[in-house]
């Protein structure tokens, strides 16, 4: 084992250090506030499940299951997997806990997912997603609601001009089978050229070819038959009803006839929010779609459903690159600096009294380091502290404290009760 291997990141994973957490907290808070306003409830479920759950939900021949999942045996020889996506685990939890009743159920969740992929910018082996799911609605209003929520999230983060919405309808299972026959005919005509760049069997699951990044094949596929021509009147009408309401509410979109989601449980409407701001390549920030048969396929009662997931690392990369004005939130509001160690006990008692008065609404730090006073003052300034409270033996003896406002550089020595009133005035907005 290499000397430093034990403290290195596992390839494809990243630490989020305290100086980066402010933007994560900022983004997550914005998202949760909007999702909550639509009356979605948070659900939490394990990051590991029985591996069969994902092969049942996603399909044994899907690349996520047969190549990208982290699978291991526990001590009882049970085959477990780290979750590669959230929908399957959410559905399992809903069935197990009997959450899916006759009414519409709205849920959201957030946490790490795991896929063994080649790490690159915007793609990691451990990545975070925020998932939003609606169970029990067969109306296009459910798709619209998820698109509307995500659109409001982009606006709240000031990135709405840097993302765009792509839509498609992939029809029901029977309609997709009809389309695959037409697509297969087209691909077999060009089989010799395709085989140079695409090693998979194009006759087995021809739709998978739309996942390729090869430029030659992508250009060739522009001539391929479109699935919209193979879907029935009901699927077509539902799709265009959604397009119509998006137009009415001025949410721009683009119909992408070759948009197919990578997971096999989707049917009818699928969508992706894309951006070209990361890596100068087209990359999905949010993906979603309808999966009416998944709950029943996993052992529950038939429950139509729609969901989407936001890739948080990608979203945060985008927000960070575009919103330079998002400043690091002040680490502390008040820094208490004792002049010497002799009064440490009195300082700690005072700091706890201050926390009681402000009911945890202010962030208060006691600097009990061995640094000299000037360095402590400098550190408080670096941390963005608004005020410094200076306590020495004289202050303790006279029941006074010295307040230094680091914004105005003004300094006051006041009796404790007067000083607390002064602090309240300085932090009026924080403590309301």
From Swiss-Prot:
What compartments host this protein? Cytoplasm
* Catalysed reactions listed for this entry: tRNA(His) + L-histidine + ATP = L-histidyl-tRNA(His) + AMP + diphosphate + H(+)
EC identifiers of the protein: 6.1.1.21
What's a GO cellular component annotated to this UniProt protein? cytoplasm
Which CDD domains does this chain map to?
HisRS-like_core
Output one GO BP term: histidyl-tRNA aminoacylation
Q: Does the keyword Nucleotide-binding apply?
A: yes
Q: Name one GO molecular function term.
A: ATP binding
Q: Name one Pfam family in it.
A: HGTP_anticodon
Entry keyword set: Aminoacyl-tRNA synthetase, ATP-binding, Cytoplasm, Ligase, Nucleotide-binding, Protein biosynthesis
The keyword Ligase is annotated on this UniProt entry: yes
Q: Which HAMAP family match?
A: His_tRNA_synth
Spell out the family assignment given in the record's similarity comment: Belongs to the class-II aminoacyl-tRNA synthetase family.
The name this protein carries in UniProt is Histidine--tRNA ligase
| Organism for this UniProt entry | Wigglesworthia glossinidia brevipalpis
Q: What is the lineage of its organism?
A: Bacteria, Pseudomonadati, Pseudomonadota, Gammaproteobacteria, Enterobacterales
